[in-house]
Structures are given as C-alpha cells and as structure tokens.
Amino acid sequence: VEQDPYEIVIKQLERAAQYMEISE
C-alpha cells in the first residue's frame, strides 16, 4: 500500500495542532 506523502504531512500537522492546543 503506497501512502500519499501529502496525507502523511496533513496527519502530522493535525497532530501538531492538537499538541499545541493542549500545551496552551
């Protein structure tokens, strides 16, 4: 199964956004 690099980046950005929300 080939993963779309953009999909990986989006998922990481979503994770980063959640982490920043928790940190605030």
UniProtKB/Swiss-Prot annotation:
Cellular component aspect of the GO annotation: cytoplasm
According to its UniProt record, the EC number is 1.4.1.3
Q: Which UniProt keywords apply?
A: Cytoplasm, NAD, NADP, Oxidoreductase
Taxonomy, superkingdom = Archaea
Q: What class of enzyme is it?
A: oxidoreductase
The keyword Glycoprotein is assigned to this record: no
UniProt keyword Cytoplasm, yes or no: yes
Where it sits in the cell: the answer is: Cytoplasm
| Subunit organization | Homohexamer.
Quote the protein name from its UniProt record. Glutamate dehydrogenase
Organism source for this protein?
Pyrococcus woesei
